[in-house]
Amino acid sequence: WEVGECGPWRLIRHHLPCRGIAYAYRYFAMDGLAFDELPYATVLACVLGKLDTARHTAAELDTLVQAHLGNLGFAVEVHEDAEDRERIRPMFVMGSSALDEEVPWAARLAEEVLRETDFADTERIRDILGQRRIAMEQAFASAGHSAAMARVASYYLPAGVVREALSGVGFYRFLKELL
């Protein structure tokens, strides 16, 4: 791997044989968010790519992603220092994959979604978040032990506390209250 610069951004490039598929991940530190604001980052990750932008409807955007990309997704992660588990950093992640010849589409669509998403359709946002709530309930029913283990981890690991707020039972409770 190698570290490089592209404008104001630092890049880490891995040269791995991927059979003509390019993968790009962009990490945004969430250091500026207070703890009680962290669940809103998950809400943002849930709705980005599923709402209209200034140039395309959500349906058109979905068609473009299906036609030109393998994936365009958003998530939140917690990164832990391998040496010091007290040092954690929540990150907002945008990931995309595309065939090598479609990389310009990946860059263009990712930028459009990040910069031009229209958040005015509150009913659509409510629907998306309602689907997320239902999916979480189904996951609790089918793999409740995993949710319980993550919840227990929040009692002794700093990263567990943040994960709980971003995607665990804590986030589920936040989401229920929000809806």
Positions of PLM-derived features:
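N- or domain-start disorder-to-order transition segments that initiate the globular core
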Residues: 1-22
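M16 family metallopeptidases and their MPP-like homologs
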Residues: 20-49, 56-116, 122-179
